[in-house]
From Swiss-Prot:
This is Mannitol-1-phosphate 5-dehydrogenase. Its EC number is 1.1.1.17. It catalyses: D-mannitol 1-phosphate + NAD(+) = beta-D-fructose 6-phosphate + NADH + H(+). The gene is mtlD. PANTHER family: ALTRONATE OXIDOREDUCTASE-RELATED, MANNITOL-1-PHOSPHATE 5-DEHYDROGENASE. It comes from Lactococcus lactis subsp. lactis (strain IL1403) (Streptococcus lactis). GO terms for cellular component: cytosol.
Amino acid sequence: MKKAVHFGAGNIGRGFIGEILSKNGFDIHFVDTNKSIIAELNNRHSYEIGIASSEHEKISVKAVSGINNSENPEAVIEAIAKADILTTAIGPNVLPYIAELIAKGLQKRKEEKVQSPLDIIACENMIGGSEFLEEKVSDYLSESDKLYLSKFIGFPNAAVDRIVPAQKHKDVLYVEVEPFSEWVIDASHLKNKEIKLEGVHYTTDLEPFIERKLFSVNSGHAAVAYSSAYKGYKTILEGLQDEEILNILKAVQKETRALLLAKWAQYFKQDELIKYHELIISRFSNPEIIDEVSRVARTPIRKLGYDERFIRPIRELNDRKLSYQNHLDIVGKIFAYHDENDAQAIQLQEKLKITELPMLIEEVTGLSNQKLILEIEKVINHYKK
């Protein structure tokens, strides 16, 4: 049986990546620090996924096990040495923390003279996730290790899309997911050309698809979340039942379409993007999914990043002299976001009290364009509570 190592036994790992790997006949080693999840994976070697639709379909995922990387790093290294594919779904901020362990696994492959190619695919909400992970892994490799890596190890970037709300069940392994899913892999950077996962789309130019997903799904979801939080709604579904918030989402989508068409006209057509955005609205409005605003709005400082879901489109729309007012509007609401259970939300509000606004905007967004900084300052003051 083919072997997969997957970092992150959370909801996306089990509810999306695990499902695809299982359907493709992989024996999956989930790597995580959650003791109860790892124990259950090793006890049962299977779990169930529920599809959040009117049919309430159930999918069984089998041939799974767990390794606690903080308690048993050697077992992770051993698993990487024998793996046919390695994937992650742990969050962009956590990738640097698994780099050393992956490096040791690759060094073991080299020591054991493993010449079968291995692709390492970061399934994260970021542009260039696998590339970023490769940089972090390379920090722990010697020159001869890097030579081995260049011959046998691939880091193809990927785009993943599936809504998996925060949830709690008696069964710690059970996870509910939306029916829609999309996983796109950059085929041009694959080392193992023989593994083609069913249920995955392969392309030789991933960037337009990553941007379409990030600027449409991530930006759109966050636009609904911060607008809903500003008006006091607790769930995405509640927020979208407010016509004002639905119209805000549509206005953000319109700006996104303008940017995607300006950049990627050879890949996308206006009518196709309109249908894609209408599908996203129906996904966000799925009555079977109760998605907390706090989940979608969490880590506001990260979401204000230079290459993130609002600042990057604003920069690129500005460069092309296209409208970005609705994206800008959401940035103002992010700075007004309060959540006493979110460390970044607390930190942002504390920074607002003690830091000059232009300096804070520059620090958080990475912007140096004074026109954009001034515009953000105005919108922050507008939404200040």
